[in-house]
């Protein structure tokens, strides 16, 4: 059964994306961050980044994933259709969040 990532907060999606892309917890206190107001970043330590990681909202964090996994976008007038090979498209008004959901679905499909 496929997980319904659309029900998760941006923080939870960001955390799962961080884990899937090989980022580590910033310190021994676990995954740091919050889902308060507009703040949804997780604090990570990785090969190319130390600090806030928020691919649901920050194009600089999302683009390397979008490019590497060939995630595509199509404007549907009121929302975005985000798609990639091997997964069903996701429709959302927030394209980066939808792209990260597609990425997680791709990871699920690869691990099935």
From Swiss-Prot:
InterPro entries recorded: Phage_P22_NinX
Domain of life: Viruses
Pfam family, one: Phage_P22_NinX
UniProt protein name: Putative protein ninX
Organism the protein comes from: Salmonella phage P22 (Bacteriophage P22)
Lineage: Viruses, Duplodnaviria, Heunggongvirae, Uroviricota, Caudoviricetes
